[in-house]
Amino acid sequence: MAISPKKRALALVVVLIVAGAVAYYFLSRHHAPEKTVTIYGNIDIRQVQAAFDDNGRLLDLRVQEGDRVKKGQLLADLDPVRFQDAVDKDAAVWPRKSRCWRACWRVPVRKKSPRPGPKPAAAQATLSNAEITWQRQQALAARQYVPKQSLDNAAAALKTARANLDRAQQALTLAIKGPRKEDIAAARQQLQADKAGLSLARRELTDTRLYAPEDGVVQDRILEPGDMVSPQTPVFTLALDNPVWVRAYLPEKALGQVRLGMKATISSDSFPGKSFPGWVGFISPTAEFTPKTVQTTELRTELVYRVRVYACNPQHRLRLGMPVTVHIPLTDNQPQKL
């Protein structure tokens, strides 16, 4: 049965329409600008090693692995006995040293010298008597009326009397004029050093307690009670999961399309159908080659820029190191002020 020319023409028109639609679809798909930038990365791993500032024996651990801790929360204790003893020692001598300092700089300075006191006068009388005795023993020894030992004793007594007189005069001068400026300065410096020593002892006592430096989760409990610790020995490893961000790499051709503050959505194979809101918080100013650990659909030799996409993660579902996919819409996505 022959096909009529009318039907043949109609079929030809239908074929042309279908072919044109298919061609338009593929051409428009090829030339239409992308509406979303998709990049791949991992939740950045952030950790802190919690350690004491001094040496000592670990007395107690207050948290376990997996516990969520707050900044400033007590984590562990060192044996404080020797640190408390150091504080008690410095605190016991501090009042006496402080009183000596106050007595030193409060001595009045007199313009007129008073009459010699009884101590210099007594020392002067002792010296005069020692000189007379020395002269008498010297004359007797010249005639060999006394043994040489008596002459030596008289000489020693004379030297002692002179030294006592000098000491008494110096004490009188200090009582009259007060301490010298150099003595006051030295006493002040010594007092400051003692005060700093007491503060250091108290600080070392405070450092026998280990507090959490940031909010996080106890990832590793490295030591146990009874272990000896040092400032180089961490006691805990804390995983910091607030805030969390994605470390990803932006292709060079998309650099001009993505800006700081743009909204993004983050998805993970661990939560099918679930997306987490986020925003672009950092774009590296330096280009680099794609790291080997990053799995992307682009060529390995393509230049990329490291980006940081912050994620809203109130329930802590996004775990550190988790691989994720980031979608950054390019339409209706004005950068927000950070």
Curated annotation (Swiss-Prot):
The keyword Coiled coil appears for this protein: yes
Coiled coil regions in record: 148-207
Listed name of the protein: UPF0194 membrane protein in asrC 5'region
S-S bridge residues: none
Pfam families named in the record: HlyD_D23
Organism in which the protein naturally occurs: Acidithiobacillus ferridurans
Annotated signal sequence range: 1-23
A GO-annotated cellular component: periplasmic space
Segments crossing the lipid bilayer: none
Predominant localisation class: periplasm
Localization, UniProt: Periplasm
Record has Coiled coil as a keyword: yes
Domain of life: Bacteria
InterPro entries cross-referenced by the UniProt entry: CusB_D23, UPF0194_transport
Membership in a protein family: Belongs to the UPF0194 family.
Alphabetical UniProt keywords: Coiled coil, Periplasm, Signal
